[in-house]
């Protein structure tokens, strides 16, 4: 029988529920259990695909093309599994499904209500994940904060599910904040007490409380939380701020979180093997070398917009025993000031994905600097498209070269809309999304990195390399090192006369893992080390 673990949050948002859920998943997997995981987001958007990165952060893309919450990236990286569209459910998706059923007549003329129709749909989404892979444990994170009106249907659904599947098969974990009063240095438990009171008023009694704090909890504080929240003392898990997120599973293991979960759910499993994870943390905390990578983007004031990119760089750093210092560079500043001011002392330059023309000229200047000064360069999605534009302008002499996204009537659209996108009017969920094969050319840097001829990578784009310019640009030194298997779509480009200049139409950052860095990020950091005199 599959067991169900629900992770809720209280007091404030952004407490780290996602990291807590991912860390627990890692601990349970290390014991030999099969783990599935999902997140419920209470917003009414169907998915985050059309949301501003400033509002939501990164959009994480799964193999099957779902545009999802960035926490799914944490889940995949920590647990080392590939998730699906069923792993991220929003209020918008739930209501869309229920209204579609009502329009089809599935409810036989009945009045459609939050209870039971919305809550039943939510429960069905939870059980669907259990049926999909038949795991030992399903971990479900409930987004938002207890007390938010948007979260109420989800909380009611997980309350009901305990009766549906049996109380011995469900466990509730509540992540909360124990703040410190700076004036006195005193830890305060009242916010936690009120948060649990709110949760209990809905009918949910937490089995475990994960208490986030800046400093360790004293025995008195732990006992006070246990008393007022009516849980066992050993079920109060302190989660003191860690120096990096990869330490969190080890910290929670020290607190005995997985032992309590195993005991309360009656799971049969072995002892955890965290040796590989311990090695990852050790290499992360004690690097031998150091590089500085500039990420040139338009959303750099919110680094979460490029979360998977930053983590993929760190994974490559772990592999090379190298501290990767990330310098966030606003591409608009490169349009106003000399690029040398921002780029002259970098070991590598990366231009990530994005949409719209704001800051694009700054990205093109950064790419020109990397090309002319032989600085290692990695371009992702828009970072490939702008690399093609830069090459067309400054090497091929097509001064008006551009993308039809930015200049629809330009004379040289070296980047153009995919043919199948030209009749698309609706923005949401209509891009080229998900996992696609790519055929690599032997003898190229891309082929050397992967060591394979056919690879599979995740995409999220509408625009592509315009094949009308393929012969001209390749004749001047642009190398097309990866294409779709039929050769029609250009997926990877390189420069033949550069130490390491590679750009991809896909998003390799989504497939990187701390124990298995993505080949392109691994080689990019390796090339950046060679430009660093400390190596």
Swiss-Prot record:
Keyword Disulfide bond set for record: no
Binding positions for UTP per the UniProt entry: 13, 188-193, 224
Something else known: CTPSs have evolved a hybrid strategy for distinguishing between UTP and CTP. The overlapping regions of the product feedback inhibitory and substrate sites recognize a common feature in both compounds, the triphosphate moiety. To differentiate isosteric substrate and product pyrimidine rings, an additional pocket far from the expected kinase/ligase catalytic site, specifically recognizes the cytosine and ribose portions of the product inhibitor.
Family affiliation: Belongs to the CTP synthase family.
Binding site for ATP: 14-19, 71
General function of this protein: Catalyzes the ATP-dependent amination of UTP to CTP with either L-glutamine or ammonia as the source of nitrogen. Regulates intracellular CTP levels through interactions with the four ribonucleotide triphosphates.
Organism of provenance: Carboxydothermus hydrogenoformans (strain ATCC BAA-161 / DSM 6008 / Z-2901)
Protein's UniProt name: CTP synthase
Assigned EC number: 6.3.4.2
Pfam families hit by this protein: CTP_synth_N, GATase
Description of how the protein assembles with itself and partners: Homotetramer.
Protein activity control: Allosterically activated by GTP, when glutamine is the substrate; GTP has no effect on the reaction when ammonia is the substrate. The allosteric effector GTP functions by stabilizing the protein conformation that binds the tetrahedral intermediate(s) formed during glutamine hydrolysis. Inhibited by the product CTP, via allosteric rather than competitive inhibition.
Residues where L-glutamine binds: 54, 354, 382-385, 405, 462
Reaction equation(s) it catalyzes: UTP + L-glutamine + ATP + H2O = CTP + L-glutamate + ADP + phosphate + 2 H(+); L-glutamine + H2O = L-glutamate + NH4(+); UTP + NH4(+) + ATP = CTP + ADP + phosphate + 2 H(+)
GO cellular component: cytosol
């Amino acid at each position: 029988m599959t067991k169900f673990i629900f992770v809720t949050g209280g007091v404030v948002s952004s407490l780290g529920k996602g990291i807590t859920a991912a860390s627990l998943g890692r601990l349970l997997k290390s014991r030999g259990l099969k783990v599935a995981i999902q997140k419920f987001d209470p917003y009414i958007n169907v998915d985050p695909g059309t949301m501003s990165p400033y509002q939501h952060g990164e959009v994480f893309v799964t193999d099957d093309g779902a545009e999802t919450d960035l926490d799914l990236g944490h889940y995949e990286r920590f647990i080392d599994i590939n998730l699906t569209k069923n792993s991220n459910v929003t209020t918008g998706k739930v209501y869309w499904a229920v209204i579609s059923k009502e329009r089809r007549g599935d409810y036989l003329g009945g009045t459609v209500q939050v209870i039971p129709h919305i809550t039943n749909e939510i429960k069905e989404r939870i059980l669907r994940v259990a049926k999909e892979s038949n795991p030992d444990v399903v971990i479900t994170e409930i987004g938002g904060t207890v007390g938010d009106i948007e979260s109420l249907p989800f909380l009611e659904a997980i309350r009901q599910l305990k009766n549906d599947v049996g109380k011995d098969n469900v466990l509730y974990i509540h992540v909360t904040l124990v703040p410190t009063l700076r004036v006195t240095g005193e830890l305060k438990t009242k916010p936690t007490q009120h948060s649990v009171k709110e949760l209990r008023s809905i009918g949910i009694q937490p089995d475990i409380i994960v208490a986030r704090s800046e400093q360790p909890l004293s025995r008195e504080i732990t006992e006070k939380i246990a008393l007022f929240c009516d849980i066992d003392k050993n079920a109060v898990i302190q989660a003191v701020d860690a120096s990096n997120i990869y330490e969190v599973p080890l910290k929670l293991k020290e607190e005995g979180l997985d032992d309590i979960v195993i005991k309360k759910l009656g799971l049969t499993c072995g002892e955890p093997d965290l040796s590989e994870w311990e090695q990852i943390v050790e290499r992360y905390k004690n690097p031998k070398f150091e590089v500085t990578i500039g990420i040139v983007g338009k959303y750099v004031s919110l680094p979460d917009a490029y979360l998977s990119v930053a983590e993929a760089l760190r994974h490559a750093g772990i592999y090379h025993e190298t501290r990767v210092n990330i310098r966030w560079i606003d591409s608009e500043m490169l349009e106003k000031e000399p690029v040398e001011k921002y780029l002259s002392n970098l070991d590598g330059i990366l231009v990530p994905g994005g949409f719209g023309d704001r800051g694009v000229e700054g990205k093109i200047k950064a790419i020109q600097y990397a090309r002319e000064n032989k600085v290692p360069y990695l371009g992702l999605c828009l970072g490939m498209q702008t690399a093609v534009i830069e090459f067309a302008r400054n090497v091929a002499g097509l001064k008006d070269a551009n993308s039809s996204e930015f200049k629809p009537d330009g004379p040289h659209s070296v980047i153009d809309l995919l043919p199948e996108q030209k009749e698309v009017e609706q923005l949401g969920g209509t891009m080229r999304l998900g996992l696609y094969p790519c055929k690599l050319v032997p003898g190229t840097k891309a082929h050397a990195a992967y060591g394979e001829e056919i690879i599979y990578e995740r995409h999220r784009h509408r625009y592509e390399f315009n094949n009308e310019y393929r012969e001209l640009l390749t004749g001047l030194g642009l190398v097309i090192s990866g294409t779709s298997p039929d050769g029609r779509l250009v997926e990877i480009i390189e420069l033949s006369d550069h130490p390491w200049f590679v750009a991809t139409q896909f998003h390799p950052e989504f497939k990187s893992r701390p124990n298995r860095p993505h080949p392109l990020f691994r080689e990019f950091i390796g090339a950046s080390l060679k430009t660093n005199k400390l190596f």
